[in-house]
C-alpha cells in the first residue's frame, strides 16, 4: 500500500503544477497583437488566473466526485479492482489530454476531470486498505499499531508533495527556464515560448501523472487482502477479539 502511494505521487501534479502550466503553456483570452504593454500584462494575468481557477475546479470535481461515489462502490467492488480500474481511466485520460495539446485548453478539461478520479479513489481506498493491513497484523501478531498506519499515510502524503515539487524543478531545468522565477509573480507570454517549453510544462498535468498512475498499479497485483482472504481475516479477528474479551465500539 505504501509503495502504491509513493508511485502514485504524480497525482499531486494536477494541483502543484497548475500555476506553472498556466504561465508557460496555456493562453486563453483576446488576441494580444498590437496591445500596449499594460494591456498585454493584464491579458496574460487574466489568462493565468482563469486557467489556474479552472484547473482547481476540474481537480476538485474529479477528486471529490470520486470520493463521494467510492463509499457506495466499496460494498460491491474490491479495493484492488477500484484502484486498478480508476488508474487505467486516469492513465488513458492523461494521455488523451497530452495528445489534445496545449493549444486546445477547453477540450482538455473533461479529460483532466477524468484524470483526477484516481486521486479521489486512492485517497479513500488507501485508508481502508491500511485498516485491512492493520487487521491482518493484529490477527497474526496480536498487536495493532494504529500509529504505524497513520505514520505511513502521512509519510506517503509528504513524500508525494516533495516528489511533485522536485519534478516541477526538474522540468524547469530540462526546458531551460529560469529557476529563480518559480513562485514569483513573473509574467511571460506563453505564445512566445518554444514548443519544447510549452509541451514540457504541459506534460506536468498530462503525461507525467499518467505514467505515475500506470506505475502505481503494479504493487496492486501483489496485494492479496481481498475476497475470501479478507473475509476470513475479518471473521477470525472478530472471533479472536470475542475470546479475549475485547470490545470495539462503533
Listing of model-derived features with the role each one plays in the protein:
Residues 1-250:
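Membrane-embedded alpha-helical bundles of multi-pass transporters/translocases
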Amino acid at each position: 500500500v505504501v509503495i502504491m502511494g509513493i508511485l502514485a505521487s504524480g497525482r499531486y501534479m494536477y494541483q502543484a503544477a497548475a500555476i506553472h502550466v498556466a504561465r508557460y503553456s496555456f493562453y486563453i483570452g483576446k488576441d494580444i497583437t498590437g496591445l500596449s504593454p499594460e494591456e498585454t500584462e493584464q491579458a496574460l494575468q487574466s489568462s493565468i488566473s482563469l486557467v489556474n481557477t479552472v484547473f482547481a475546479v476540474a481537480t476538485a470535481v474529479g477528486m471529490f466526485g470520486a470520493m463521494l461515489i467510492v463509499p457506495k462502490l466499496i460494498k460491491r467492488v474490491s479495493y484492488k479492482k477500484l484502484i486498478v480500474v480508476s488508474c487505467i481511466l486516469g492513465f488513458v485520460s492523461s494521455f488523451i489530454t497530452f495528445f489534445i495539446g496545449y493549444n486546445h485548453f477547453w477540450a482538455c478539461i473533461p479529460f483532466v476531470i477524468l484524470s483526477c478520479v484516481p486521486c479521489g479513489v486512492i485517497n479513500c481506498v488507501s485508508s481502508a486498505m491500511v485498516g485491512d493491513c492493520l487487521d491482518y497484523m493484529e490477527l497474526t501478531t496480536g498487536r495493532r499499531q494504529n500509529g504505524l498506519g497513520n505514520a505511513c499515510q502521512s509519510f506517503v502524503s509528504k513524500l508525494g508533495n516533495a516528489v511533485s515539487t522536485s519534478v516541477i524543478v526538474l522540468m524547469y531545468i530540462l526546458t531551460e527556464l529560469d529557476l529563480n522565477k518559480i513562485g514569483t509573480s513573473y509574467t511571460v507570454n506563453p505564445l512566445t515560448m518554444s514548443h519544447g517549453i510549452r509541451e514540457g510544462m504541459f506534460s506536468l498535468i498530462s503525461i507525467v501523472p499518467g505514467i505515475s498512475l500506470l506505475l502505481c498499479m503494479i504493487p496492486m497485483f501483489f496485494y492479496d487482502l481481498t475476497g475470501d482472504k479478507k473475509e476470513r481475516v475479518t471473521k477470525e479477528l472478530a472471533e479472536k477479539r470475542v475470546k479475549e474479551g475485547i470490545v470495539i465500539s462503533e
